[in-house]
Design a protein with these regions (language model features):
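N-terminal leader/targeting pre-sequences
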Residues: 5, 12-14, 18-175
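N-terminal secretory signal peptides that target proteins for export/translocation
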Residues: 1-2
């Protein structure tokens, strides 16, 4: 028993000195057209319930705007380079947090409400999705977040949210 003491102390000291980094994702959102004042950030964190996404935007026209993860990690051509909604299960459009992964695209985040000052925040958990494809779930790493010009009415096939006014590519970071 006496010999175990120094070993336990060395393990505890070693663990307390090590740094553990959690992988998170981030996207820097910028306007998709010349002269646009749209800007923002998205932070993505895996949780037991799914992928937590927190988006903050500024310089956006007031009102509700559709917010989706798109299939490609590119923002060129006024956001069109991002392709369509991220939909690996080939299911109808919907609101993922409410409808679940069998009745909504993997990237359907709903709407962000932007106030009169042009800023807005959305915090949502996307079930059945992860940053890096953990546990066989679809991965969003390297894909784009698109801010649309209009409200997502959850209609088919893509919610009628109009053009793409903001875009940011999701990248993995260490925290």
């Amino acid at each position: 028993m006496r010999r175990l003491g120094p070993w336990v102390v060395s393990v505890v000291v070693g663990l307390s000195c090590s740094t553990v980094f959690a992988e998170t994702g981030k996207a820097v959102i910028q306007g998709t057209s010349a002269g646009s004042k749209v800007s923002g950030t998205a932070k993505l964190t895996d949780t037991r319930q799914g992928l937590k996404v927190v988006v903050n935007v500024a310089g956006v026209p007031p009102g509700k705007h559709g917010l989706h993860i798109h299939e490609k990690g590119a923002c060129g051509d006024q956001g069109k380079a991002a392709g369509g909604h991220f939909n690996p299960a080939k299911v109808p459009h919907g609101f993922l947090p409410k409808d679940g992964p069998t009745k909504a695209h993997a990237g359907d985040m709903g709407n962000i409400d932007v106030g009169p000052n042009g800023s807005g925040k959305l915090a949502v958990v996307l079930p059945g999705v992860s940053l890096k494809g953990t546990g066989g779930t679809p991965s969003v790493d390297g894909r784009a977040i698109i801010l649309h010009e209009k409200v997502d009415d959850f209609g088919q096939p893509t919610g009628n949210a109009g053009g793409r006014i903001g875009c940011g590519v999701i990248e993995t970071t260490k925290e």
